[in-house]
Each structure stands twice: as C-alpha cells, then as structure tokens.
Amino acid sequence: LTRAAGISLAPTFVAFTPWTTLDGYIALLERLLELQLVESVPPVQLCIRLLIPEGSHLLHLPGFKEQLLPFDPEHLGHPWVHGDLQALVARSEARRLPRREVFAAVWQLSHEAAQRPVPQLAEDLGSAIPRLSEPWYCCAEPTEQQLQSF
C-alpha cells in the first residue's frame, strides 16, 4: 500500500532483547526478505541490542544475565556477550558496503550459527530509500562509533 503511494518505509526495531532466540532472529531476517525491506533497513538495525542499564529488573530473568558482561559505565549499561554481528556490521559500514551485502553477510552468519543451510537470497531485496547519514536509536546499546563521537 505504501509503495503504491510512493511512501518509503524505514522500519525500526530492537533485534536483540532478552526474549530473542536464534530461530526468532532468522525469522525476522526472513520477514524482511518477504516484505522486500532489506534496502530500507540500516545495517546497524540488524544488530541493535536492548540497552540494559545498571540495576535493570531484566537482570532477574532466568538465563539472561549470562548473555551480558558486567556493567560498563562507558557503554552506559551491561554489554552483551555476543558481539559477532555488531563487529561484522561495524566493519561493513566502515567499508561502506551496500545494505544488500551487509544483509547477506548477516544472513550467512546467522544460518551458520544455527547450523542450518544458507538459502540463496533473491535478486530483488527492495528499493533503496532516502536515509540519514547516521541512524541513532533510543533504548539501544550504543555502538563503538557512537561512543567515540562523544
């Protein structure tokens, strides 16, 4: 409907929360493909992790604390243990890779982590949309690039 009206969507979401599973994450990637939104989603969006401040009640969730490092005042919260995707996206953005290429790398890494075959991506992943030079999201753990800019 919005495409037919010439309106570009730039969806935002927090990919990693205490309730995110690897299967759920892959399902999110599959949905972005189905909706042809790959070119509409900034690569950093694919690795955004919920900011967990000191004293958060979320730390009481069974098994969640094990996914975090101790509180780090420089990061304004508890850094998440799994940094693979964040490092991949940071390297890709530093190289100014197209969104399609970053998504393909995330797609492959995610499927490999789940020990699943990596399905080939379709040619049409959506159209490029107007965008800002630096996406920033509230409630998300800051990226290294954002921390260095202070």
Enumerate the language-model features and the residues they cover.
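Conserved C-terminal portion of the radical SAM core fold
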Residues: L1-G55
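Radical SAM enzyme core and accessory elements
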Residues: H57-F150
